[in-house]
Amino acid sequence: MAFTLEEIVQRFGGEIVGDRAHRVGNLAPLDQAGPDQLAFLANPKYLAQVETTRAGAVLINAADLAKLASPDGRNFIVTPNPYAYFARLAQAFIDMATPKAKRGVHPSATVDSSAQIAATAVIGPNVTVEAGVAIGENVRLDANVFVGRGTTIGAGSHLYPNVAVYHGCRLGERAIVHAGAVIGSDGFGFAPDFVGDGDARTGSWVKIPQVGGVSIGPDVEIGANTTIDRGAMADTVIEECVKIDNLVQIGHNCKIGAYTVIAGCAGIAGSTTIGRHCMIGGAVGIAGHVTLGDYVIVTAKSGVSKSLPKAGIYTSAFPAVDHADWNRSAALMRNLDKLRDRIKALEAAVASASGDKA
């Protein structure tokens, strides 16, 4: 299905420069787009590609359009944020191209008679819905999804195959949960009950029942194989519009503030609070019982062991270097205490010599 630039602007806004009747049917990168495709410029370092692209039209901001040597004869949609415009337009194209699932409950699904399921919901093959569950309008549960007792899933949410949502959890409207994610599994809570020391130590770990739940706000997206533990007594809370990548672990009683994004393989220990509009890089590790303020950015592979209350960018990871350089640096680090002692001795000797001269 193709649309004129005029039709696109009527729905998404922006200003057309060029042929308002030109039709485009999908999106493509600047260096690959053809006359029936729409491209976008989000980074001015690719401005040269706009000069040579074959795209039928380009999403661009006014400042970058003004830098073009020869914009005449081509089509543009001018918008302050071409990247966000592209994202919304791409979603619209996908929605139109995706076949609509058949509403209702698949014959192979197991649904408790007390569950409340909206007539517009889609319950796929082998889905299990336990007692007291409430599923809103236009919710889609793909194959093998499990929804535990007393859980609520808000309207417009989509749970992909093999998602498990344990009992007593709440998912807000338009939640997207990708395949294999687990929401509401037990938090990692064990009380030590040991007597003695060393080889004479006896006893065991006593499991602490996790009686809280998980509360997820609207417009949250959770990546594949991510796990969000239920709270020990109160809920683990994920606020509105949080975006969580694949393979992220969020411990019990954490609170993740609205509009925060968390990249893949990050691990957040229990009872940690992360503020609003934060950015957590890939493979970041955050210790338990710490607080990150609003607008905190933690770069990839950093370890956070204490609270970071002030907005800013924080880094503790060591970037990759040549292997031989790393070995030399590691050798120096192992000997820093000896070097410190030598420097102190030299400073003392200099001070003593200066005193003798005086």
From Swiss-Prot:
GO biological process entries: lipid A biosynthetic process
Top-level taxon in the UniProt lineage: Bacteria
Annotated keywords: Acyltransferase, Lipid A biosynthesis, Lipid biosynthesis, Lipid metabolism, Repeat, Transferase
GO terms, molecular function: N-acyltransferase activity
Catalytic activities: a UDP-3-O-[(3R)-3-hydroxyacyl]-alpha-D-glucosamine + a (3R)-hydroxyacyl-[ACP] = a UDP-2-N,3-O-bis[(3R)-3-hydroxyacyl]-alpha-D-glucosamine + holo-[ACP] + H(+)
Residue positions of the active site: 252 (proton acceptor)
Pfam families: Hexapep (PF00132), Hexapep_2 (PF14602), LpxD (PF04613)
InterPro entries per record: Hexapep, Hexapep_transf_CS, LpxD, Trimer_LpxA-like_sf, UDP_GlcNAc_AcTrfase_non-rep
Entry EC number(s): 2.3.1.191
EC category name: transferase
GO CC field: membrane
Subunit structure: Homotrimer.
Function: Catalyzes the N-acylation of UDP-3-O-acylglucosamine using 3-hydroxyacyl-ACP as the acyl donor. Is involved in the biosynthesis of lipid A, a phosphorylated glycolipid that anchors the lipopolysaccharide to the outer membrane of the cell.
Protein's name according to its UniProt entry: UDP-3-O-acylglucosamine N-acyltransferase
Source organism per UniProt: Paraburkholderia phymatum (strain DSM 17167 / CIP 108236 / LMG 21445 / STM815) (Burkholderia phymatum)
Lineage of the species this protein comes from: Bacteria, Pseudomonadati, Pseudomonadota, Betaproteobacteria, Burkholderiales
